[in-house]
Amino acid sequence: GVQTCALPICMIDINKIPSPCYVMEEKLLRNNLSLIKSVKERAGVNIILAFKAFALWKAFPIVREYIPFSTASSKFEAQLAFEEMGSPAHTYSPAYTEADFPLILRYSSHVTFNSLSQFHRFYPMVRADGNRVSCGLRINPEYSDVETDLYNPCAPGSRMGVTGDLLGDTLPEGIEGLHFHTLCESTSYDLERTLAEVERRFGRFLPHVKWLNMGGGHLMTRKDYDVEHLIALLKGFKERYPNLELIMEIGRA
């Protein structure tokens, strides 16, 4: 179960804490969540929780007060979102199996595919399910500030997402959104440069889709993060593409 204490961690005798266990300071969590919610409301974007960085489900009742939705990368994370966050997941995985995909559909509101061939393979199952989920395609803007190629999803030869040259002038019927994930503990200026590349390589699609998921890596709770620049950047992008719902994934922040 969950034990609560009104004292800050600095005033608790850590030797009396049963081990092993997770210890979380609620005040600090709420401080971060309050900032994230403020960005969400001021910029008019949707910010969702990324389980890969924070999946302490006993804290979800607190998180839901600020962020009601989450992202998943497996059927089990999607189930966690549905059952413990109380909302269907925005799901992306580099690969799906036909055995697992019905569960992905059951627990998701959005499903992003890594390639066109993957979309064409599974879209009949989406249609058979009544088109309840919104389908997206992961794109590779061929630009990232990540310095180590091993962790760079845009490195030469990367198979994470579709490059612009592999797409024609229109997206296949059924694709309602685009998704990129190229940042890691990055700044708002990194996002600005990335969005410029997304517009340059995929701008022809942006007026015609419903949403753009900008992935994770937005460390907006870091002390030196320029939150005001982020809000202005997002507002400006929405002014150019008023049809788009902008989605950000928050994990470590």
Which residues are covered by each model-predicted region?
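Conserved N-terminal beta1-alpha1 strand-loop-helix module at the mouth
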Residues: 12-33, 37, 42, 54, ...
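Generic structural "secondary-structure junction" signal
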Residues: 4, 19, 24-25, 153, ...
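Short, small-residue-biased leader/transition segments that mark boundaries at the very start
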Residues: 1-7
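Active-site-proximal beta-alpha core segment in soluble small-molecule metabolic enzymes
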Residues: 45-211, 233-236, 240
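Generic structural signal for well-ordered, non-membrane alpha-helical segments
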Residues: 22-29, 33, 115, 191, ...
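Active-site anion/phosphate-binding pocket segments in diverse small-molecule metabolic enzymes
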Residues: 10, 19-23, 216-252
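A short small-residue
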Residues: 12-17, 176-181, 215-216
